[in-house]
C-alpha cells in the first residue's frame, strides 16, 4: 500500500517463490482503490493459500489478474490452493532444481510453455494437498517455512541431495 500510494498510474505486482505468494496476498488485501490500478499479478512458482484466503472478497476481486507460472515438475508452486490457472513453463533442470527461474527456458520473447505438469508434480500436488488439508493454519505455515529453510540450509536441488546433506 505504501508503494502504491507513492507510484502514479497502473501497477504490476510480482514475486518468485515465497515472494510470489506475498505478491498475490498483497494484491488481494490492499483495498479496492489500489486493486483497480493493478494490471497484473505475476506469481513465479509461489505457493497458494488455504480455502479461507481463496474465498475472501479481495482475493476474488484480483483473481482474474493473477498469472501463476510453474515449471513442469513444480513442488513449491503446487503447495496449498490456487484458483487461477497455472501456466506451465519448461525447465532445463530436474525436480527441485526447477524452482530456479534461471533454468526456465525462454524462446525469443516468452517462456517455452507446456500443456501440463509432469506425473511427479501431480503426485506431489495430490499427496501434499491431502496432507496439508489435515493441518492447522499454524502447522501449514511452519511446514512451508521448514521446507524453505531445509532447502536453503542444505543447498539441496533434489530430494536425494536434501537427504545426503541433512546431517552435514
How would you describe each model-predicted region?
Residues 1-11, 31-168:
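Alpha/beta hydrolase fold serine-hydrolase catalytic domain that processes acyl esters and thioesters
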Residues 14-19, 23:
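Gly/Ala-rich beta-loop-alpha elbow adjacent to hydrolase catalytic centers
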Residues 23-32:
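Short glycine-enriched nucleophile-adjacent loop
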Amino acid at each position: 500500500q505504501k508503494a502504491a500510494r507513492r507510484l502514479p498510474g497502473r501497477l504490476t505486482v510480482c514475486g518468485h517463490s515465497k515472494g510470489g505468494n506475498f505478491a498475490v496476498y498483497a494484491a488481494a488485501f490492499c483495498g479496492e482503490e489500489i486493486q483497480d490500478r493493478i494490471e497484473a499479478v505475476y506469481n513465479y512458482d509461489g505457493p497458494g493459500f488455504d480455502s479461507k484466503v481463496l474465498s475472501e472478497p479481495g482475493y476474488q476481486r484480483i483473481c482474474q489478474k493473477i498469472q501463476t507460472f510453474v515449471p513442469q515438475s513444480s513442488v513449491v508452486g503446487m503447495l496449498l490452493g490456487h484458483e487461477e490457472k497455472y501456466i506451465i513453463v519448461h525447465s532445463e533442470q530436474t525436480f527441485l532444481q526447477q524452482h530456479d527461474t534461471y533454468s526456465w527456458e525462454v524462446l525469443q520473447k516468452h517462456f517455452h510453455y507446456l500443456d501440463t505438469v509432469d506425473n511427479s508434480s501431480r503426485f506431489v500436488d495430490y499427496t501434499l494437498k491431502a496432507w496439508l488439508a489435515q493441518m492447522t493454519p499454524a502447522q501449514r505455515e511452519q511446514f512451508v517455512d521448514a521446507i524453505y529453510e531445509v532447502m536453503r540450509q542444505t543447498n539441496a536441488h533434489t530430494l536425494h541431495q536434501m537427504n545426503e546433506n541433512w546431517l552435514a
